Amino acid sequence: MAEQASSFTDRLAARFAGAQISVVQPRGEVTLEVAAAQWHATCLALRDELGFEQLSDLCGVDYLGYGSDEWDTADVSSQGFSRGVEGKALGRFAWGEFPSQESSNGAQPQQLPTQRFAVVAQLISYQHNQRLRVRCYAPDEQVPVVASLTDIWPGVNWFEREAFDLFGIVFDGHPDLRRILTDYGFVGHPFRKDFPLIGNVEVRYDDERKRVVYEPVTSVEPRVGVPRVIRDDARYETAAGEVGKSETAK
């Protein structure tokens, strides 16, 4: 039987003093947030002491622009989302430009978060029938570095390579940290929020050179098709209300 989230978080708090622990209700998801300096030691203790023998997934996260929306209109607009096409929000800019994060109405650039890049690992304990999410933030956003977990869970090898390829997160101690998804000579890291949505280069076949060539993007104009909108998901509120009703009925 799965351990209740409350008792499980108590054990985590007792073992990892000073770590930030959160529980998402009503799903009962537990997240353990640790400092980058304690990332490797914490994961080792989770495997050896708390029985998390499998790492099912690891990914990078870029929190640049997190929590900000591009369309905060409360009422229906007859003009649609025309404002976003003029602005240079995250990812919506052309070759050679840098995202100013300035909206079309002249708003000041948004302050970048102090902790931009994070690494998130999903762990499973079969003996305790428990799942855990572990997260740490890279201290330096210019060169994000965290310790590799390949000596704890060897299967994380390609997950870390993927996070390096897509986000540029360096995993210290990785035995073979190189790109895994992008092409040879690829410039940048495509899952970063400041990476242009239209890309940096385009590919075409050159008849004179008789080969494929890479050139700066010139045939695609950046535009907004879908605005970034923050909404409250009523599904979770409904689920929480149903749980409350069932507890009251008991």
From Swiss-Prot:
Pfam family, one: Complex1_30kDa
EC number per UniProt: 7.1.1.-
Subunit structure: NDH-1 is composed of 14 different subunits. Subunits NuoB, C, D, E, F, and G constitute the peripheral sector of the complex.
Gene Ontology cellular component terms for the protein in this record: plasma membrane
Residues passing through the membrane, by range: none
Catalysed reactions, as listed in the record: a quinone + NADH + 5 H(+)(in) = a quinol + NAD(+) + 4 H(+)(out)
Membrane topology category: Peripheral membrane protein
Function of the protein: NDH-1 shuttles electrons from NADH, via FMN and iron-sulfur (Fe-S) centers, to quinones in the respiratory chain. The immediate electron acceptor for the enzyme in this species is believed to be ubiquinone. Couples the redox reaction to proton translocation (for every two electrons transferred, four hydrogen ions are translocated across the cytoplasmic membrane), and thus conserves the redox energy in a proton gradient.
Domain of life: Bacteria
Keyword Transmembrane helix (UniProt): no
Protein name as catalogued: NADH-quinone oxidoreductase subunit C
One GO MF term attached to the UniProt entry: quinone binding
Family indicated by similarity: Belongs to the complex I 30 kDa subunit family.
InterPro entries membership: NADH_DH_suC (IPR010218), NADH_quin_OxRdtase_su_C/D-like (IPR037232), NADH_UbQ_OxRdtase_30kDa_su (IPR001268), NADH_UbQ_OxRdtase_CS (IPR020396)
Keywords from the named record: Cell inner membrane, Cell membrane, Membrane, NAD, Quinone, Translocase, Transport, Ubiquinone
Compartments reported by the entry: Cell inner membrane
